[in-house]
């Protein structure tokens, strides 16, 4: 094995190890925020939704600046600083007894994510070849689902004793991840060329095709973020016990472990990235509409499983499509900007989802948030259909050959 290939291989193993800590730390805390502050403390879903939306919007909305800093300074200092800031945010969350304290903790967590997320994503692009990238994203998703389940199980177990323990455990995982990155992560440069911050940002903003794709993702994320807000609340309502919330993540993990990689391998040779993404989005929107009408826990879990199946189909295609559209001369800036759709979708999805949930309860129309989410999904699907057919996106076969829209793939 050549030294370059060995470096790539070791780098990918480190990314997988690092991802375990990051995902477990996140899911140990965030899925339980709505349970803690809405169900246990009696806050409105809108109030908690604003906090979660604020975290999402700041982290993803400022991602282009985090990515631009990483293009300039390298990945390592940004990742370490961001993880330490996320740990501090979790400590503040553990003592939050007023809305402003929860918001401060979410802002700190968001700023940490702004610093470490774009360079980590750009490292995946740097360390994987185009033809293996889709499969590596699938492996990361399998790992995400498994670690999310384990993190949520540990968090819900600790919640029986004290929410402070939940937040402390999450903070310790991010602290450990920061130490590992300081010790083991090489000082990678994530872009192919020496690019100034302003030049990297300019490249992204003038790339109309990429910008359009990112903003259209807003509707997709409005649907997907509900697994962190009103979906756990709905499961808790139907089941009448907190333990049932854990099973939603167990379902996701089981489906990911059994289906994600086989589906990715099978579909990548038969369908375009665009069609795979739209098929997954279609399944998600069709499964989310009836949730408010269901009062049987088994049927609810079935719909959740179908929703996750749609996500399993859509997510690897979305990640790979976004990477194929990025300019390798400014990887960090592109990957940072790519999170803007999640920023907008998260802010609208959390605050809007919480508001719709409260309105549905006030009007005694529990179906309201779910039907509206389905309509948003349909509009998004139509937007992607028009976009993909108008702009003639780069085909998957061209992507596998290592050619991007801006330049040949270079490491």
From Swiss-Prot:
Pfam families in the record: MFS_1
Domain of life, per lineage:
Bacteria
Q: Classify the main location.
A: membrane
Specify the protein's topology with respect to the membrane: Multi-pass membrane protein
Q: Tell me the name of the encoding gene.
A: mdtH
The record, for InterPro entries, names: MFS, MFS_dom, MFS_trans_sf, MFS_Transporters, Multidrug-R_MdtH
Annotated GO MF terms: transmembrane transporter activity
Spell out the protein name for this chain.
Multidrug resistance protein MdtH
Question: Which protein family is named in the record?
Answer: Belongs to the major facilitator superfamily. DHA1 family. MdtH (TC 2.A.1.2.21) subfamily.
Q: Gene3D superfamilies from the xrefs?
A: MFS general substrate transporter like domains
The record, for SUPFAM superfamilies, names: MFS general substrate transporter
Q: Which organism's genome codes for this protein?
A: Baumannia cicadellinicola subsp. Homalodisca coagulata
Compartment(s): Cell membrane
The UniProt transmembrane annotation reads 13-33, 45-65, 73-95, 99-116, 139-159, 165-185, 213-233, 243-263, 288-308, 340-360, 365-385
What does UniProt list as this organism's lineage?
Answer: Bacteria, Pseudomonadati, Pseudomonadota, Gammaproteobacteria, Candidatus Palibaumannia
Q: Looking at the UniProt record for this protein, which Gene Ontology cellular component terms does it annotate, in alphabetical order?
A: plasma membrane
Q: Mind telling me which PANTHER family this protein's record contains?
A: MULTIDRUG RESISTANCE PROTEIN MDTH (PTHR23517:SF2), RESISTANCE PROTEIN MDTM, PUTATIVE-RELATED-RELATED (PTHR23517)
Please name the CDD domains in this protein's record: MFS_MdtH_MDR_like
Entry keywords, A to Z: Cell membrane, Membrane, Transmembrane, Transmembrane helix, Transport
